From Swiss-Prot:
Residues 250-389 form the Flavodoxin-like domain. InterPro entries: Flavodoxin/NO_synth, Flavoprotein-like_sf, Metallo-B-lactamas, ODP_dom, RibonucZ/Hydroxyglut_hydro, Rubredoxin-O_OxRdtase. It comes from the Archaea. It holds the Pfam family ODP. GO terms for molecular function: electron transfer activity; FMN binding; metal ion binding; oxidoreductase activity. This is Uncharacterized protein MJ0732. SUPFAM superfamilies: Flavoproteins, Metallo-hydrolase/oxidoreductase.
């Protein structure tokens, strides 16, 4: 077995697992794969921070064994109980009898996944510290980023923040640091934020305040690469994304049966572009939902088009709307459009989702058409796009 391990600072090691093949992460498209980052600290007490999925146990053990006997683990820090991070905890406890360090919610959630009645726990809260020898570990609770049990671990002496899901990216690569990839890493971080953290972004400013008070040389997330060169930049981007800062951008999402809705989408897009709006158009059946949500994160306008099928939405549009309702982007201008035969229902269903999300809905008589749009109707769609570009909150 040839697997990668890396010393990231003196006595601190990346011993995670690279998942080259994964393309779907509980509904979130991962075209570039992912990693499950686990970190080993060798000190008077040997500490493992987070683990990996249960079926990756052998790879994780291999990495740990390069530096210590896994039986010699003293502490396992569980920053987050989701099983891509805690999946190997039960087997590691069985091998090592290590004490679990987590918060009260973390203990509760672990007990719902595993038989923990014989496990030893140290329960921590924000501000608590544990000395492991030459180093001290400090803990910061970040509930609902993105589970109630989430927390951060900070190594004061080494100036390392072990951030778990915060600042993560789904990317499988041989590179372990941000500067090895370059500024392209921000797009991966944006994609992760949009699809994992967007529903809870109102909580992020408080977490950012806590992080900014720390002296940080490395941010070590549990997915993707380690932040070293771009620490200030990624913190600032998180702040921007959390504060709903938008660009003059429209995302148009549609599906079509006989190209009627497609023609409307493109006509509206032409009008928007005429007024200088950046436009992204996606036929939803040909694009991953996570890719679309990444573009919606900083868009001002969200336009959704669907033909009516048996008094309902076109199936892939319905799937997209359910996903968007789950991710919950805020402060958008919403437009529903589409074609129908004898009963128009799709646009009303789209607007119901918009209302649920608090979008400002813009309507116009040109946004629905029976059967197929003629040139005069497409001209109205084009003019509507131009008018839409002048609408704000």
């Amino acid at each position: 077995m040839i697997l990668m391990v890396l010393e990231i600072k003196n006595g601190i090691y990346w011993v995670g697992v690279i998942d080259w093949e994964i393309r779907d992460f509980h509904g979130y498209g991962t075209p570039y794969g992912s990693t499950y980052n686990s970190y080993l600290i060798k000190d008077k007490k040997n500490v493992l921070i987070d683990t990996a999925k249960d079926y990756m146990f052998n790879e994780l053990i291999y990495g740990i064994s390069k530096f210590i006997d896994p039986k010699d683990l003293d502490y396992i820090i569980v920053n987050h109980v989701e099983k891509d991070h805690s999946g190997c905890v039960d087997k590691l406890v069985e091998i090592s009898n290590a004490t679990i360090i987590t918060n009260e919610k973390g203990k509760e959630h672990l007990s719902l996944y595993y038989d923990t009645k014989d496990w030893d726990f140290i329960i921590v809260d924000t501000g608590d510290e544990i000395n492991i020898g030459d180093r001290t570990l400090k803990f910061i609770r970040t509930p609902m980023l993105h589970w109630p049990d989430n927390m951060l671990t900070y190594c004061k002496e080494e100036k390392i923040l072990f951030s778990n899901d915060a600042f993560g990216q789904h990317i499988a690569s041989s590179e372990r640091f941000d500067y090895e990839i370059g500024e392209g890493i921000f797009e991966h971080a944006k994609d992760y934020f949009a699809n994992i953290l967007m529903p809870y972004k109102m909580l992020i400013p408080d977490a950012i305040k806590a992080v900014k008070n720390l002296d940080i040389e490395l941010i070590c997330p549990s997915h993707g690469v380690i932040w070293k060169e771009y620490i200030n930049e990624i913190i600032e981007k998180y702040n921007e994304w959390a504060m709903n800062k938008t660009k003059n951008k429209a995302v148009i999402v549609y599906d079509t049966m006989y190209n009627s809705t497609k023609k409307m989408a493109h006509a509206i897009a032409e009008g928007l572009m005429e007024k200088g709006v950046e436009v992204k158009i996606y036929r939803v059946c040909e694009t991953s939902l996570s890719r679309i949500m990444t573009e919606i994160l900083d868009a001002k306008y969200v336009l959704v088009g669907s033909p009516t099928v048996n008094r309902n939405l076109y199936p892939e549009v319905g799937k997209f709307l359910a996903y968007m309702d789950c991710i919950r982007p805020l402060d958008k201008i919403g437009v529903a459009f589409g074609s129908y035969g004898w009963m128009e229902c799709a646009t009303e269903k789209i607007k119901e989702i918009f209302k649920n999300l608090g979008f400002k809905i813009v309507d116009d008589e040109c946004l629905t058409v029976r059967f197929a749009p003629k040139e005069e109707h497409l001209k109205k769609c084009y003019e509507f796009g131009k008018r839409l570009a002048d609408i704000g909150f």
